[in-house]
């Protein structure tokens, strides 16, 4: 993502409260500081203008109309003795209205609030760092129990209040007067920690380097213990070791990114720019508003109520304050992720609110639909089909897609070769599909790679480069071996094709992204170009053969019978008779017989093979031995045949196979020979 400031990436992460305030804080020319949203109101019901310090305040987020303040004045109407940069009356700056797309605000929370992504996510980063069960942390955050602060030289009164309710209730008559005294607020703030503030204190006290050292020591101790023989204990030990590794990785990541763990607890809540959560007025006095506005309103109302109670803390009951803190926590949770508390929050019409997580995540979220899924020039999309005649680095582009992608290059070459005089005539030739257009198109495509992408692009092999070739039809042809990298199959999957324009992009595609350069998985190093799905079915059909074996010949179930030897172009060909399976002296003879439809693809046959000591030295007992009049004998085994003379010398060996096996073997042999030649060139 490149903008005018040359920012090349967008990163989501934790930021400090000071950074959030710096994003939203704005100092007006008169020295007034604005940026904090304190009111839940949006627009005034009479004037339809944004409320001051509300969610659409023009002082905080900028003017609705460019150069016009909330009073309706412009820079030209400012008096000579006044500052021309903003309106003295309403405090709105005379700037472009596009500032409302990126100017943020903030809400100063009356109590700390945990970020629900880091508390309830899987895995829970807060529970991982603190090494505590998630249920106990949730009970602490939502006020189910408290824990005592480690205050020096001061007595501790409560420790895990939720675990000592029975003991406290027995002394209720003597404790109740103490809790109702005005000094209890001071005692509570000194001795008791609850809510997200307690989590923040524990995170702030962490030393990440000590966490890494202690976790490493514990992991080594568990590793040295080995297996105990108790399946349950061994399983617990394995889970603990995995947890320690994740904890060390998380702490190391915090150190490397200069992020403090306590930033996972919010003190300031950012407010999105108003253009990203608009309110639209339709005909008939209908108002359509973003759900995020309603969720922000709920947070502000509950936060203001809590701030009011804290100001009157001497009169407000402690349970009421804790209940209000819980409501603020739940309101922020709903804003960030409405389904974090189980059932999603609904409005008065039983409609589920869309939280920030719902706006961001998924196929229709902000990233995949708006930022990553935008339509771009020099691209196309079509269904993929198998291209069995293609090389690994090739893809077949339909004529319709190819001429659209390379149209500008074809026009340039038409004018350069003086086939046309201007662009208009060149476009007419392309429209009329003249023969010279296809010739130039093939020349242009010969040295220009294309990029194929299948969504979702989950790893690096989701987009690869190919050399395009023209094919008939309207589908993109793809070599079946590259399907595993794309996680694609040929049941209707679609792929997008992109054209790299600059020389740098073309060089990167050739050197890094070509399919024959990505034969191994970048994650684990295993081969990624392996036969799958359609190829496996094709190889199975090619090599299935006859399952009845050699004994089928005795019952003539194959329909293959003895052959008479004929001299066909000086080659040893055998025609079928009605007794025996055919014999061939080479694979070329067998392929010739198949082309002449003398044999079938899976018909059993005998193929003369080179003398193999593994076959000769086999201790297998022959099924049958046949002798001829001149002393020649034939030893018939399950899968091969040995021909010898009367001196017991082996003259030839025949193996029992099918034409499918022969074709498969020839392909593998040619591939190995080609690899050997390429390897010898590199030495």
UniProtKB/Swiss-Prot annotation:
Annotated keywords: Chloroplast, DNA-directed RNA polymerase, Magnesium, Metal-binding, Nucleotidyltransferase, Plastid, Transcription, Transferase, Zinc
GO biological process: DNA-templated transcription
Quaternary structure annotation from Swiss-Prot or TrEMBL: In plastids the minimal PEP RNA polymerase catalytic core is composed of four subunits: alpha, beta, beta', and beta''. When a (nuclear-encoded) sigma factor is associated with the core the holoenzyme is formed, which can initiate transcription.
EC number(s) recorded for this UniProt protein: 2.7.7.6
InterPro entries for this protein: DNA-dir_RpoC_beta_prime (IPR045867), RNA_pol_asu (IPR000722), RNA_pol_N (IPR006592), RNA_pol_Rpb1_1 (IPR007080), RNA_pol_Rpb1_3_sf (IPR042102), RNA_pol_Rpb1_clamp_domain (IPR044893), RNApol_RpoC1 (IPR034678)
Cofactor: binding comment: Binds 1 Mg(2+) ion per subunit. Binds 1 Zn(2+) ion per subunit.
Catalyzed chemical reaction(s): RNA(n) + a ribonucleoside 5'-triphosphate = RNA(n+1) + diphosphate
GO molecular-function terms, A-Z: DNA binding; DNA-directed RNA polymerase activity; magnesium ion binding; zinc ion binding
Protein name: DNA-directed RNA polymerase subunit beta'
Source organism of the structure: Zea mays
Enzyme class, broadest EC rank: transferase
UniProt-listed PANTHER family: DNA-DIRECTED RNA POLYMERASE (PTHR19376), DNA-DIRECTED RNA POLYMERASE SUBUNIT BETA (PTHR19376:SF54)
Gene symbol of the encoding locus: rpoC1
């Amino acid at each position: 993502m490149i903008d005018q400031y040359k920012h090349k990436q967008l990163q989501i992460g934790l930021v400090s409260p000071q950074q959030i305030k710096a994003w939203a804080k704005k100092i007006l020319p008169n020295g007034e500081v604005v940026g904090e949203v304190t009111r839940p109101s949006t627009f005034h019901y009479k004037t339809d203008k944004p409320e001051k310090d509300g969610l659409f305040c023009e002082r905080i987020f900028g003017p609705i109309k460019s150069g016009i303040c909330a009073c309706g004045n412009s820079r030209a109407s400012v008096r000579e003795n006044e500052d021309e940069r903003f309106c003295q009356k309403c405090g709105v700056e005379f700037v472009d209205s596009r500032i409302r797309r990126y100017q943020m605000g903030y809400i100063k929370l009356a109590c700390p609030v945990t970020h629900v992504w880091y508390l309830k996510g899987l895995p829970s980063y807060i529970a991982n760092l603190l090494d505590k069960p998630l249920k106990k942390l949730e009970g602490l955050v939502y006020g189910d129990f408290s824990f005592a602060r480690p205050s020096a030289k001061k007595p501790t009164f409560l420790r895990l209040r939720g675990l000592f309710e029975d003991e406290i209730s027995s002394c209720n008559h003597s404790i109740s007067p103490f809790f109702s005294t005005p000094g209890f607020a001071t005692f509570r703030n000194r001795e008791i920690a609850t809510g997200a503030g307690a989590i923040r204190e524990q995170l702030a006290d962490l030393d990440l380097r000590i966490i890494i050292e202690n976790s490493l020591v514990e992991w080594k101790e568990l590793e040295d213990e080995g297996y105990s023989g108790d399946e349950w204990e061994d399983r617990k030990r394995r889970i603990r070791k995995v947890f320690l590794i994740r904890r060390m990785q998380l702490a190391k990541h915090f150190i490397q990114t200069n992020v403090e763990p306590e930033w996972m607890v919010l003190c300031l809540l950012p407010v999105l720019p108003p253009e990203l959560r608009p309110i639209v007025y339709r005909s008939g006095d209908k108002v359509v508003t973003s759900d995020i506005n309603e969720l922000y309103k709920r947070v502000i109302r509950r936060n203001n109520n809590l701030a009011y109670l804290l100001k009157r803390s001497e009169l407000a009951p402690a349970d009421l304050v804790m209940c209000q803190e819980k409501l603020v926590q739940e309101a922020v949770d709903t804003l960030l992720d409405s389904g974090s508390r189980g059932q999603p929050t609904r409005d008065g019409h039983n409609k589920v609110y869309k939280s920030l997580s719902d706006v961001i995540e998924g196929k229709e979220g902000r990233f995949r639909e708006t930022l990553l899924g935008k339509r771009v020039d020099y691209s196309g999309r079509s269904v993929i089909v198998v291209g069995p005649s293609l090389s690994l680095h090739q893809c077949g582009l339909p004529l319709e897609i190819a001429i659209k992608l390379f149209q500008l290059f074809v026009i340039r070459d038409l004018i350069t070769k003086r086939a046309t005089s201007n662009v208009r005539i060149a476009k007419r030739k392309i429209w009329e599909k003249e023969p010279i257009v296809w010739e130039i198109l093939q020349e242009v495509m010969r040295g220009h790679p294309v990029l194929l992408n299948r969504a979702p692009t989950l790893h690096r092999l989701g987009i690869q480069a190919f050399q395009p070739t023209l094919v008939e039809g309207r589908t993109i042809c793809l070599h079946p071996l590259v399907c595993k990298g794309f996680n694609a199959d040929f049941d209707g999957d679609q792929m997008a094709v992109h054209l790299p324009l600059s020389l740098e992009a073309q060089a990167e595609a050739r050197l890094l992204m070509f399919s024959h350069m990505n034969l191994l998985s970048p994650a684990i190093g295993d081969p990624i170009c392996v036969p799958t799905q359609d190829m496996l079915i094709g190889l199975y059909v090619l090599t299935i053969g006859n399952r009845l074996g050699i004994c089928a010949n005795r019952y003539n179930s194959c329909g293959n019978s003895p052959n008479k030897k004929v001299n066909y172009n000086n080659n040893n060909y055998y025609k079928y008779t009605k007794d025996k399976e055919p014999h061939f002296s080479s694979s070329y003879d067998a392929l010739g017989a198949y082309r002449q439809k003398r044999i079938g693809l899976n018909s059993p046959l005998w193929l003369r093979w080179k003398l193999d000591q593994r076959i000769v030295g086999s201790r297998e007992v022959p099924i049958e031995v046949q002798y001829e009049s001149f002393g020649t004998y034939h030893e018939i085994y399950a899968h091969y045949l040995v021909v010898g003379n009367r001196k017991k010398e082996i003259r030839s060996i025949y193996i029992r196979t099918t034409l499918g096996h022969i074709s498969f073997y020839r392909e593998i042999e040619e591939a190995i020979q080609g690899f050997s030649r390429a390897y010898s060139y590199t030495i």
